[in-house]
Amino acid sequence: MPTREELVLERIRDTPEGFVRAYGDVSPGAPRFAGTVLSANHDPDLPWWRIVRADGSLAKGARQRALLDAEGVPFRSDRVDMRIARLP
């Protein structure tokens, strides 16, 4: 049985290019745990930039924005347009 951390990492890896998930989507009921997992992970292939705050705002700023822009993620001002880009 996978650990809680492994489940979070699996959900992050399963987030396809051009879409995002909120911290609470990858760690239901414990969004801060997702942040802890991300900050402790050093896998260069983990698409960390696809995880955003529930309101679409970015935790990592300019670098995260550039990576999401390159994938065609839609924005409304400085936030991801969660109505379009958030996975159900």
Cite the ranges covered by each PLM segment.
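Nucleic acid-binding interface residues in structured DNA/RNA-binding domains
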Residues: 1-88
